[in-house]
Amino acid sequence: MRFEDIGISKVDKVCLVDRLGCQENLVGTVHVTTTHIIFRAENGSKELWLATGLISSVEKGTLTAAGCMLVIRCKHFQVITLLISRDKSCQDLYETLQRAAKPVSVNVTELLAFENREPVEDVRGWRRLDWNSEMTRQGITKSQWTESNINEGYTICDTYPNKLWFPTAASTSVLLGSCKFRSRGRLPVLTYFHQQTEAALCRCAQPLTGFSARCVEDEKLMELVGKANTNSDNLFLVDTRPRVNAMVNKVQGKGFEDERNYSNMRFHFFDIENIHVMRASQARLLDAVTKCRDVTEYWKTLEASGWLKHVRSVVECSLFLAESISRGTSCVVHCSDGWDRTSQVVALCQLLLDPYYRTIHGFQVLIEKDWLGFGHKFDDRCGHVGALNDEAGKEVSPIFTQWLDCIWQIMQQKPRAFQFNERYLIEMHEHVYSCQFGTFIGNCDKDRRDLNLSKRTKSLWTWMDARHDDYMNPFYSPTAHVALLDLDTRAARFTVWTAMYNRFDNGLQPRERLEDLTMAAMEHVGVLESHVAQLRTRLAELKTQQNQQITSTNTPTNMVDSGMSSATDDLKNLSLSHPLDPLSSTLPILERATSQESGVMDSSLYYPDEALTKYSLKWQPLRGADRCSNPACRGEFSSTIERRIHCHLCGMIFCRRCLKVSADERERVCDKCKTD
């Protein structure tokens, strides 16, 4: 948001209303900057920051005796309700927030990501995908598929990457002819090669057939795609649109392929609706999860939204593709322009087939390849910049959100197949819209290069790499699943993703997340086991020193044995005990034992109590931990998705800002423990 768009920069005596009535309302001040909306409570108990790019809509209520209500709905599904006593202040703030939600400027360089004042040296983040390395990893047979420089400099298709792979037998004239016959020049190209069956997954846009047009070069290219598979030359062409929609496009000179003109090809339609239907569907879904007050109304609104039906359609189409490729049949997929529904099903199909894409790093590579590389229009679909007219505003649609929802549905059935957890998906979704990073800015790869984003903005991947442990799934087993082809696609298996759509609705008794409880327990056990290992090491040192003293001083054996037996036996008992057993009863024994001896013990063998009591046996529970334990911070955890992190020494919960990682990256300690 530009400085001149700020009509009012500060509003006092604003009441932050808890719409669920679970917490007390807070009086404070609202500050408006070019990048954030900030609410700070007068008593200092709460400070809420909201990036202006996350504002979706603003609603102003009627003036009452108490004041005027202002409801801010966000793209990451937070709902903020403000009660402002003065109507003039409310109107000024409303108009300011409206300009943030619907920016007048169409200049993408005014986004938050470009406000970065630090020098950008983010090579790893901006080079997450290396096309040649990825195709080599897939095991492409160069005798059948080859890299082409036909789109070098984005000359034939500006929404495709400049590196493309085609059947080796395809000539340049065939490629150019097919390019002219496909919408937006998006001809069939390889995106995934299944090494076990040599089946290929290709993507493209709809053909410009109209009612009778055909293209010999396009037909030849499709034939070569089928023949590139030495195990089967059959080819499935999957149109993700409803058949009636494809028929309507014929009137516009577009449409779908005539099966009679393509040899060895079978046609399949899948009824995945367009961006306008999905936008309306999500709006009804949000009405159900945020506005409905009784169960009957909730279920009626949810059913009317059709959201779960649409999610199911995407999963079913992706599963069909995965099953076909695993059986050895190559597939070509398109929708209208090949950057919305095609990106959804092609990427989800690869996720089902290849366990690499179900890792944290591999998932980022998949997004870079099939969403960013092949031109999903993130600027338009996410509404990053203002629209020149109302028609351009209708380009906004939750296509990427829906794809993440599909992945979450699969995670519920296969919880051990994914290295990452749902926090990974939710935080990624937030930053797709926040525009804090440059990764998801631009409509295609060419846009991002023209904007020089790698030099001017930071990569989301680097930011997430620094929080890698936040996204680990404690139940992940790399060998548990290879291909996920046994999904249950019955309607009852698809449910509302409440952690996403009700992320900020904590309620009276917010539940701890099972993943977080498990991770905290595993981390605690790991810390204690590490401490036990240190004690065992110290025990070995004591034994070594004992033997050295025997040799050097020629002390009678019975005196040494009597002097050391008490200490070493206690350490043995301690090292063999369970890491979670209380150690308080055994901790003082070493000091007592050594102090009672008659001068035989060397001072270097003394092992003080503070070394044994370094780690807390009892950690602060996650339940009720809604604030950082640092008295100077007391930062609030606004939702259960925000990770509560334990100090390895005192066991208290802190926010990430108040914890420091040791030099060897083995310990995480708070400022107080670090000082002590």
Swiss-Prot record:
Membrane topology: Peripheral membrane protein
Domain Myotubularin phosphatase: 125-501
Zinc fingers classed as FYVE-type: ranges: 618-675
Positions that bind a 1,2-diacyl-sn-glycero-3-phospho-(1D-myo-inositol-3-phosphate): N249, N274, I275, S336, D337, G338, W339, D340, R341, R381
Keywords per UniProt: Cell membrane, Cytoplasm, Endocytosis, Hydrolase, Lipid metabolism, Membrane, Metal-binding, Zinc, Zinc-finger
Transmembrane segments: none
Domain comment (free text): The FYVE domain appears to be dispensable for membrane targeting and activity but may be important to increase avidity to membrane.
Protein name in the entry: Phosphatidylinositol-3,5-bisphosphate 3-phosphatase MTMR6
Chain's gene name: mtm-6
